[in-house]
Amino acid sequence: LHRSNGKKSDVWGLVGGTNEGTETPWEGLKREIVEEIGDVTTIKKTLPLESFLSNDKKFLFHTYLCVVKDEFIPQLNKEHDGYAWCSFTKWPKPLHHGLRNTLQSKINLSKLETVFQTINLLDN
């Protein structure tokens, strides 16, 4: 998603936000998906990719991989003005710094590659 406003504007990132009240990370993810792209029904499977604590130890970040059956046109909210379906190795730029760090991690790339290979095997 291309961020259109706020302090992190003009960068490409993922659906995201802060959990509200007593929300679990999973509940927060579902709510943020609905708020930012409009629909969770297209998601076949959701897999945790990574969790990490911010440098100041104030925030615990969770990143998930959501597998969809088919690409779709998201209903973007006012936070975003664009979206892209990308190949595994060709990401739009500039990336949000957190997403860039996630995608530079060899562990995360290995996890993503395994999931994509598994999906391709199952779909053939």
Segments from the language model and where they lie:
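N-terminal strand-loop-strand
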Residues: 1-14
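Short aromatic-enriched loop/helix-cap "lid" or pocket-rim segments at secondary-structure transitions
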Residues: 12, 97-98
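Active-site-adjacent beta-strand/loop module that shapes the phosphate/pyrophosphate-binding cleft
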Residues: 50-73, 79, 84-90, 106-108, ...
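A small-molecule sensor/coupling module
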Residues: 98, 104-109
